[in-house]
Amino acid sequence: METKRFYEQTGVAMTCRNFEEYVRMFDLEPEKLRGKRVLDIGAGASAFTAEASRREIEARAADPLYAMGPSEIEGLGLEEIDRFIAKLTERRHMYNWDFYEGPELLKELRKKSFADFAADYANPASREEKYAAASLPELPHSEDEFDLVLCSHFLFLYGEQFGPEFHLRAMRELLRVCKPGGEVRIYPLLTFGGELYPQLPELLAELAREGVTAEYRPTRLAFIPGSRDYLTLHKVAD
């Protein structure tokens, strides 16, 4: 099993992904999201919310990181990118580089994404409107608030740190803030050990008893070894 471990991580990392990565990860159709309300959970320093807003998508982001000010995050972000690339390079043979081509280009994409986020976050009005200092399994958002809820590189991936009860509460919370008829999408479905999150079938069975339907859909950014699918949870319409 250890040979499948594709990344070493202590604590929860700060992410710095861009809009196109989200489009590919979750197979999004940006034009269909115009005017829709979208929540990015565990967004970190990703630029999805900034770019989505420019595309007339009502995007919001939630992460405990936002308890910090812009200058604090800026220092942490650049350090995190360097650590991430160094650890990734050690096991570069395990990844699918079709999109990123190699660590050097990936680093440049991360830096550009972080700069885009930082510029948006540094604007006081934008920061207050779009970025909530919050973490699962309890969010400050209203029930039935968002058409689409995204959770990237947190649930399941950190399954060695957060147990199944946490995951069940977190998934219920994502569904709570999702509008009836809306969707929750989660990617990837693997732990850092390279295995499908072991308790995922049991979690989905419990949600099914609560009226939630789930399906696996193919991702268009299968960078992590074995990460071919993302999970979609459908909230039943009234």
Language model features: what each stretch is:
Residues 1-36, 47-55, 67-78, 83:
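Class I SAM-dependent methyltransferase Rossmann-like catalytic core
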Residues 147-164:
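A short SAM/SAH-binding and catalytic strip from SAM-dependent methyltransferases
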Residues 165-180:
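A short glycine-rich, Lys/Arg-flanked "PGG" loop and its adjoining helix->strand segment in the class I
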Residues 54, 58-129:
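Class I S-adenosyl-L-methionine-dependent methyltransferase module
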Residues 137-150:
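A short acidic, Gly/Pro-enriched loop at the edge of an enzyme's catalytic core
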Residues 192-238:
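Class I S-adenosyl-L-methionine
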Residues 127-139:
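Conserved SAM-binding strand-loop segment of SAM-dependent methyltransferases
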